[in-house]
Amino acid sequence: FKEGDIMLPPGKKAFVLSQDDVCYYEYMDGDGFASRMVIGEDGKPTCEMKLDDGSVVTGDYDLVPILNRFIEEHPGFSYKGAKGVLAFTGYNGILGYRTAASYSESPTYESDREMAAAVAQCLRDDGWELASHSWGHRNMGQISMENFITDTTKWENEVDSLIGPTDIILYPFGADIGDWRLYTTENERFNYLYAAGFRYFCNVDSNQYW
């Protein structure tokens, strides 16, 4: 890593926008959240929501379509089409599709995986970055190394296989695998994640860096 200048048009400020847990977990059903992300009639990612009467509507029901709508009205907000970072766990599937191996007996399992992969590619094409949030929403700095490896392997098998390679991880719980100092090759967890292809290691934290 080497610090440098971020070149932007005058008056613009760089910041990182991220959303984790973009999975639409089962526990969220019936609580006013979107149920899943889909590809809209315009070819852009949007959200479905199930209403109390059982009907399904499509619209701006989460960050992705809300931000896309804002950028349509304020194109100067997005520099060269950049959007944000969306991070996924895997234990309940991704994007509202039950893609985890635990759902493999479901009659919609294969179609869910196909649809999730298509939506993930649509997000990439639309300027979004995709990232890991661990497979099981684990504290990656506190779990045993054995569980750390198991979690990362599950994420590779059940999520990476759908969204394609990513080099970004957003740690759950605002946790970290080190302290405030730079990672070194003496950090076994850093070495493992680096070997798995990760290059950007992010906390869930809105504070300025030190």
Language-model features: where?
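Short, flexible, glycine/charge-rich loop motifs used to bind or transfer phosphoryl groups or to couple energy/partner
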Residues: D5-I6, N191
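Generic enzyme active-site microenvironment
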Residues: S18
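Short glycine/threonine-rich loop-to-helix capping motif typified by GTGT followed
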Residues: D179-T185
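Metal-dependent polysaccharide deacetylase catalytic core of the NodB/CE4 family, i.e.
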Residues: K2, L8-F15, C23-G178, N207
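Substrate-binding cleft of secreted/luminal carbohydrate-active enzymes
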Residues: E158, F173-D176, N187-W210
